[in-house]
Amino acid sequence: GEHALQAAHLAMEEGCAANIVVASLLHDIGHMLHALPDDAPEQGIDDLHEELGFRFVDKYFKHEVAEPVRLHVAAKRYLCAKEPEYLGRLSEPSIIILHLQGGPITEAECRLFEQNPFYRDAVQLRRLDDLAKVPNMEVRPLDSYRTLLTGQLK
């Protein structure tokens, strides 16, 4: 939807690598793959959309697209642990969701996260995800990503 197009548009504007642009476009596809209500977080349910999204994306796209999708929630938990100002910028709904997802990770978990070769890509995707919440933003149409998308297919 609109959020995904904004994230991908911002990735293009920042000159991100193709895998990040495509991951930005697909990172929340897991929300479309489950049957949970939109207010699942308010009901105390973590929809695990990053895992559902990863399974779908990993089936069709290169690992360097799929892995940041899988890690984009972990990247939020990582940033909350590493950057107090990041945690301070989260909206009330984001804080509710953060706690459902397990809250900020420990120092040991941070070190483990940093061992993943795609952790920097995941953090970059997370920052794009956070910025892609502007009402009525002018964005590139979905069709403009066709070449990038096909280039990242398995």
What are these model-predicted stretches?
Residues 1-3, 9:
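A positional/architectural concept
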Residues 8-125:
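Divalent metal-dependent catalytic cores for phosphoryl transfer on phosphate-bearing substrates
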Residues 131-154:
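Charged phosphate-binding loop/patch that engages nucleotide di/tri-phosphates or the phosphate backbone
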